């Protein structure tokens, strides 16, 4: 059987695609603990970008905002409207929390498409968006759960737990299960969408490295923004629900 060089090249390309792996991690050993270094490094980069942008934009605030200050005031107004719509008139104290969630997830998602993480080589695994890792999304979801429990308990006290037996005690197991499914759905939805988007781009770049991946990358940017909005909206809705009562 004759195997042409073209066939060998095609087979090699398919083999390279089949070698795309997930789940490879780079750890730091600190004392008796293993720290997931990839997530920490990329999260620090995202936090630095956010803090640096805010400091530069508002270092000299003007009565009539211009440029960066105007942009961040627009973002703040958007987050305030989102919080007020979902939480109600008592939204004020929760704007920083919802805003932090939205901005961190938004910049994290976009960093996976816009920052050249791949050029930084690690002993194991590779750098990617923080939200590309299940540890990050689970942590964000658990923070959201803690926030809506705190919101309900701070407003209603122990009577908050009456929601589990409303409208009838028969629904107690379902109402308890609902509180477990909320963080699960939040974390896996965000993780799955971001991971799938990055894998699709990697495979397309391996197949056709020039033009074809570009529309998919733009679609990924749009999807990343939508996922950040969905997470922040649901977080605010859960907080509002815990303060108002069971729906």
UniProtKB/Swiss-Prot annotation:
It comes from the Eukaryota. It comes from Zea mays. It is a multi-pass membrane protein. The lineage of its organism: Eukaryota, Viridiplantae, Streptophyta, Embryophyta, Tracheophyta. InterPro entries: ATP_syn_F0_a_bact/chloroplast, ATP_synth_F0_asu, ATP_synth_F0_asu_AS, F0_ATP_A_sf. The chain crosses the membrane at residues 38-58, 95-115, 134-154, 199-219, 220-240. Its main location: plastid. F-type ATPases have 2 components, CF(1) - the catalytic core - and CF(0) - the membrane proton channel. CF(1) has five subunits: alpha(3), beta(3), gamma(1), delta(1), epsilon(1). CF(0) has four main subunits: a, b, b' and c. This is ATP synthase subunit a, chloroplastic. Belongs to the ATPase A chain family. The gene is atpI. Keywords: ATP synthesis, CF(0), Chloroplast, Hydrogen ion transport, Ion transport, Membrane, Plastid, Thylakoid, Transmembrane, Transmembrane helix, Transport. Key component of the proton channel; it plays a direct role in the translocation of protons across the membrane. It holds the Pfam family ATP-synt_A. GO terms for molecular function: proton-transporting ATP synthase activity, rotational mechanism. It is found in: Plastid, Chloroplast thylakoid membrane. The keyword ATP-binding does not apply.
